[in-house]
Amino acid sequence: MDLMMAQNSTYFTPGTEYRYSNSGYALLALVVERISGQSFAGFLHENIFLPLDMNGTVAHEEGISTIFNRAYGYTFSNGAYVPNDQSLTSAVLGDGGIYSSTTDMAAWDHALYKAQLVPYYVLNEAFISGTLTSGSETGYGFGWVLDTYLYRNRVSHTGSTTGFKNVYQRYPDAGLSIIVLTNRSSGSPKDIANGIAQTIL
């Protein structure tokens, strides 16, 4: 927060352009804490992870959280993969710091299709593109990239940090979701996910 408050300029006049930023999610986590009176990690655990039986998912808090069966990151160097793992404290909660599995991510995905956590009318707002003051759409909703692939609507997001690259794609009209989690810095999970979509769709 101190880093954000120290800024005295913006890249452009707000509303005139779109630029992805993790800072907004870090700020949102602070808003959740202020309104709920809980830590952000505690709020996620109580309101999302527990209700959905995401028992292997943790929003990491240094000195508090335990991460079982954790995968470690690697980078290809000098002809071999070598450990190159992020620090457990390198990700700020809100825009990162969550450890999960494909099984738990599937539970989260199912909850989105069934609107288990919030009503459909609230959930659907996340899948509406932002609009600039010019009237142009940004192609980004509330935490989702909105585009088309193979002539189908797609909502997705990528994520990466030292030693890890991941992608989560959803094709709501087809009821198809693809989650690719990797523990290496090289390669393209998005290409893998696109290939899976091509095979299925």
Predicted regions and their residues:
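Catalytic-site signature segments of enzymes, centered on catalytic residues
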Residues: M1-T66, S90-A106
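Catalytic loop of the DD-peptidase/beta-lactamase superfamily, centered on the K-T-G motif
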Residues: E33-Q38, G42-E46, L50, A80-L201
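A short, ordered amphipathic alpha-helix with a cationic face
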Residues: E17-R19, G79-V82
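A generic membrane alpha-helix/interface feature
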Residues: N55, N69-A71, P119, T133
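A generic structural signal for nonpolar/aromatic side chains embedded in well-ordered alpha-helices
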Residues: L3-M5, Y74, A126
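Short alpha-helix boundary/capping motifs
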Residues: A59-E61, F76-S77, T133-S136
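Mobile, glycine-enriched helix-loop/loop "lid" segments at the mouths of ligand-binding/catalytic clefts
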Residues: S65-S77
